[in-house]
């Protein structure tokens, strides 16, 4: 067994194809050699029946991962055109002179722009048949035709240049010209379907029908599981937790580390529904309304112009969203992204987005799991939850959606081109949703209120007024700091009797919201309501492919491949022993008290633990909390 780097495999393929292109062989021979080079790459990863048979199949990557690594290789040829492209475009220009100007302009464009223009032209030509049918019902040149043509112009804006001329005095000539456009355009559409734009190798770096069917079946299984394993989110608790993050001063976040960015980055994704890469690096946002922003820079759009703008909702005030996003992106932990996107060298074949996602997913997802109190949850769940909240909040009341159904709403609000993709974003349901819900500002000091209810019981607590004075001191401390932990050492500083202090802390424990931890020290009892409501039956984690393309999710740049032949199973070799998963503590987000101390809560082995004390950073506080109970 040896490690073969994906980057090396891809670079080998690229070098081989470039050498073939530069050779003086006949084009037919070049095509055969390019096809063979693509086959060698596919065999090294997945298709070699000698390598991947018997027990060797256990070492083979999944079909979905194979497709993702194929996508990486294809992206290396994205800027290269097919060897016959120029010749075929010239032929089409001569054959369809009414479209010659558009077609000829492609010859001077970058490959990405050619794809965009070709896609736009195909969309325009697909409108010919329905437009021609509607136009046949219009008596061009009659008195009532102007209004009908105006409606057609509004419905088919790409054809306005020709439709508007039908209202002129020479409408007969313009009508005949339009029909010629229709005639040539219909034939051109058929030929554009056959036009090869991409480099020849891309037509061989494709999945076989069986492999594609396998992936499609997996997607269907995932969708079926999602629709039968919905996750219920307590709306008020979830949104209150998000607002608590957004309303905290940025100074309380440790924005000098990757993991320290997680709370604010997740909260901004939660209120905008944008992907991690769009929040942290690629997206551009401008306030367009109190709860709307203009968004450009959608990820996973191969042929879309990055300047395309969408109007999306924000679940907090748009101005606050943009301000916090600017603050997050300007922090020290995000200052090296321009270097990160360059990768670690020529063998780093991940996309720029994939390189950033790789470092951020590892830093953010552990915090997300602790935020939800659910190991099944990951950062990108914020996108589906946002879509559900936005639907409940805006779909029925915003006139923008009055003529469309919910599938179109989900598709547009998430920026999808395919209406089927949004089906994967409906796993989450909301409990206790209300459009009139507003976040609590947290002004009420509940601990102080509970202590005040004990006032009448204090005069007889100790001799004289000692009990009353002790009680008043505690109330003052809690009034100054509602989250203060009151301990024996806290009250000894005020010269009260240690015996009376111990009695008082036990007596007022419920009012103070404190308990004695396993270390014998007083700890704050912080009861955070569950965000994910429990299911009646346990729901297993759904191992799913990504919603569109997995390439950006794959941060591994090497896999292990067996250099020799596939191993046949032998009687001596038994199945691998299953290793039990090691228990890991699940921490809730560290709470910075603002005085150099932190509050830490975590779950371990089915038990809840709490700790409070001084620490230099949230991570140090978590380490101290762990070592307090498990040194």
Curated annotation (Swiss-Prot):
Residues 533-592 are annotated as: Disordered. GO terms for biological process: DNA replication; viral DNA genome replication. The active site is at 425 (nucleophile). Residues 534-575 have a biased composition (Acidic residues). Optimum pH is 7. One of its GO terms (molecular function) is DNA binding. Keywords: DNA replication, DNA-binding, Endonuclease, Hydrolase, Nuclease, Viral DNA replication. Optimum temperature is 25 degrees Celsius. The keyword S-adenosyl-L-methionine does not apply. Its EC number is 3.1.22.-. Monomer. Homodimer; in presence of DNA. Converts the circular intermediates produced by the viral replication and carrying a joined telomere site to a linear DNA molecule with covalently closed hairpin ends. The viral circular DNA is cleaved at a palindromic site called telRL thereby generating a linear prophage plasmid with telomeres. Binds covalently to the 3'-phosphoryl of the cleaved strands. This is Protelomerase. It comes from Escherichia phage N15.
């Amino acid at each position: 067994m040896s490690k073969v780097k994906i980057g090396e495999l891809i670079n080998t393929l690229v070098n081989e194809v470039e050498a073939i292109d530069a050779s003086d062989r006949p084009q037919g021979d070049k095509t055969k050699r390019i096809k063979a080079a693509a086959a060698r790459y596919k065999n090294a990863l997945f298709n070699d029946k000698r390598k991947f048979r018997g027990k060797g199949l256990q070492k083979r990557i999944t079909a979905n991962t194979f497709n993702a690594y194929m996508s990486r290789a294809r992206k290396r040829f994205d800027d290269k055109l097919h060897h016959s492209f120029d010749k075929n475009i010239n032929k089409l220009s001569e054959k369809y002179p009414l479209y010659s100007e558009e077609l000829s302009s492609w010859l001077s464009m970058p490959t990405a722009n050619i794809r965009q223009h070709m896609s736009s032209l195909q969309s325009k030509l697909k409108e010919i048949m329905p437009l021609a049918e509607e136009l046949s019902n219009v008596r061009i040149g009659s008195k009532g035709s102007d209004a009908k043509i105006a409606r057609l112009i509004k419905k088919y804006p790409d054809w306005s240049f020709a439709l508007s001329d039908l209202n002129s005095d020479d409408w007969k000539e313009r009508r005949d010209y339009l029909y010629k456009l229709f005639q040539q355009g219909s034939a051109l559409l058929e030929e554009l379907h056959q036009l090869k734009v991409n480099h020849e190798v891309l037509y061989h770096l494709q999945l076989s029908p069986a492999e594609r069917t396998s992936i499609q079946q997996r997607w269907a299984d995932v969708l079926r599981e999602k629709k039968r394993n919905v996750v219920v989110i307590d709306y008020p608790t979830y949104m209150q937790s998000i607002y608590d993050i957004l309303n905290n001063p940025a100074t309380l976040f440790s924005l000098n580390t990757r993991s320290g960015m997680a709370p604010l980055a997740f909260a901004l994704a939660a209120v905008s529904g944008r992907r991690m890469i769009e929040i942290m690096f690629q997206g551009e946002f401008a306030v367009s309304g109190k709860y709307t922003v203009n968004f450009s820079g959608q990820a996973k759009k191969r042929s879309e112009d990055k300047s395309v703008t969408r109007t999306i909702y924000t679940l907090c005030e748009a101005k606050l969203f943009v301000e916090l996003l600017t603050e997050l992106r300007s922090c020290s932990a995000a200052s090296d992204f321009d270097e990160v996107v360059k990768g670690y060298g020529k063998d780093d074949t991940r996309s720029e987005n994939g390189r950033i996602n790789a470092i951020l997913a590892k830093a953010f997802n552990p915090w997300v799991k602790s935020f939800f109190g659910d190991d099944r949850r990951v950062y990108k769940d914020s996108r589906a939850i946002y879509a559900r909240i936005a639907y409940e909040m805006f779909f029925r009341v915003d006139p923008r959606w009055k003529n469309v159904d919910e599938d179109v709403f989900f598709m547009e609000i998430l920026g999808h081109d395919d209406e089927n993709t949004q089906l994967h974003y409906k796993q989450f349901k909301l409990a206790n949703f209300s459009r009139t819900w507003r976040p609590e500002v947290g002004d009420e000091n509940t601990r102080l209120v509970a202590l005040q209810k004990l006032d009448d019981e204090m005069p007889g607590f100790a001799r004289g007024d000692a009990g009353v004075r002790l009680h008043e001191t505690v109330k003052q401390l809690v009034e100054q700091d509602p989250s203060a932990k009151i301990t024996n050492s806290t009250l000894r500083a005020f010269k009260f009797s240690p015996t009376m202090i111990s009695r008082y802390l036990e007596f007022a424990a419920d009012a103070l919201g404190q308990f004695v931890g396993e270390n014998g020290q007083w700890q704050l009892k912080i009861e955070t309501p569950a965000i994910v409501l429990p299911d009646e039956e346990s729901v297993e984690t759904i191992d799913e492919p990504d919603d569109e393309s997995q390439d950006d999710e794959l941060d591994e740049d090497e896999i292990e491949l067996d250099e020799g032949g596939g191993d046949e199973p032998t009687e001596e070799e038994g199945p691998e022993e299953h290793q039990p998963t090691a228990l890991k503590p699940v921490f809730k987000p560290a709470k910075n008290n603002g005085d150099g101390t932190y509050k830490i809560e975590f779950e371990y082995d089915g038990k809840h633990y709490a700790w409070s004390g001084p620490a230099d950073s949230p991570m140090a506080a978590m380490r101290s909390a762990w070592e307090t109970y498990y040194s």
